[in-house]
Regions:
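Adenine nucleotide-associated cytosolic modules
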Residues: 1-300
Length: 300
């Protein structure tokens, strides 16, 4: 148990309520990261907490001003990773409406403040599509994302989600950046219900080529190359040593163990980080494999 995190949920809920109250008092406007707005949110949080104590309802011993500050400062920001997470939650709740599963009957707060960079960073807006992301993580992180070279194996359901995420967050979208995608399969009618980048008119077309074209439409700055070759021992002439050596990390979005273990073996050999993930019905798994720090996929 993380004793330092006790009452963290209550602190988050109180901070969220303070932001909502701020909006109510300021014409539906979210607070900015100005000292004036943050101080106002902290004052509101303390008032709400005092009211909770008086009514013997939800309250905390002492309001955590830092939690309120962070919640207020980033309340205006919207980034693709958070949108995807909450989109998944909403989708699951819609499935639960059938009565087969138990719905969420309480507030759900997703706390990822620990992902914020330590120390001062340049968060000045650039007037670009990535401003919200820059406001949270800083310009240096955004520049690194833009220069990344990555290789994604598979352009099905997971692959479609990753292509969208890469395009929206600017991964491989800067000078020198590159996203390479391969899938030797073509789009079928049965794919359309879960591989959301594809439409009826795409049936029969290459998954990787189509996904990359649509990713480019989402963000014209996306530097993307599509391949149609299977990643296997007989295609080492396509995915050769210089190809693997040039990568910063690899993404598995395949649907079989054989392909996963082969890509895992390549990543072990060339010492490349691997993002492994998969889905099964309403369930999913993900695994980040870091050379010399974690087990490889085949060993886990």
């Amino acid at each position: 148990m993380k004793f330092m995190g006790m009452q963290r949920s209550e602190q988050l809920h109180l901070a969220f309520r303070a932001v909502l109250k701020f909006r109510e008092l300021n014409g539906s406007q979210f607070p900015s990261d100005s000292a004036e707005h943050i101080d106002e949110c902290i004052r509101i949080a303390n008032t709400l907490n005092d009211e909770g104590k008086a009514a013997e309802q939800l309250n905390v011993e002492q309001v955590d001003a830092e939690v309120v500050r962070l919640t207020a400062a980033y309340s205006r920001c919207s980034i693709t990773s958070m949108a995807a997470f909450f989109g998944g939650i909403v989708a699951q709740e819609i499935v639960k409406f059938t009565g087969k599963y138990s719905p969420i009957k309480q507030m759900l707060h997703y706390d990822v403040f620990e992902s914020l960079p330590e120390g001062p960073v340049n968060r000045a807006p650039r007037g670009c599509r990535y401003d919200d992301q820059i406001r949270i993580y800083g310009q240096e992180v955004q520049d690194k994302l833009g220069k990344i070279h990555t290789f994604m194996v598979g352009a099905g359901a997971l692959g479609c989600e990753y292509i969208k995420a890469f395009a929206m967050m600017g991964l491989g979208c800067g000078e020198g950046g590159l996203v390479q995608v391969t899938d030797n399969d073509n789009i079928e009618v049965s794919n359309l219900n879960r591989q959301f980048l594809f439409r009826k008119n795409n049936v029969g077309s290459s998954k990787s080529l189509t996904a990359c074209q649509i990713g480019k439409q989402m963000n014209p700055g996306l530097n993307v190359v599509a391949h149609t070759s299977l990643v296997a021992p007989n295609t080492v002439n396509v995915f050769n040593d210089p190809f693997w050596e040039d990568l910063d990390f690899v993404v598995n979005a395949v649907d079989n163990i054989k392909a996963r273990t082969y890509v895992d073996g390549r990543c072990v050999w060339f010492e490349k980080p691997l993002l492994e993930s998969g889905t099964l019905g309403t369930k999913a798994n993900s695994q980040m494999i870091i050379p010399h720090k974690t087990q490889c996929y085949s060993d886990s």
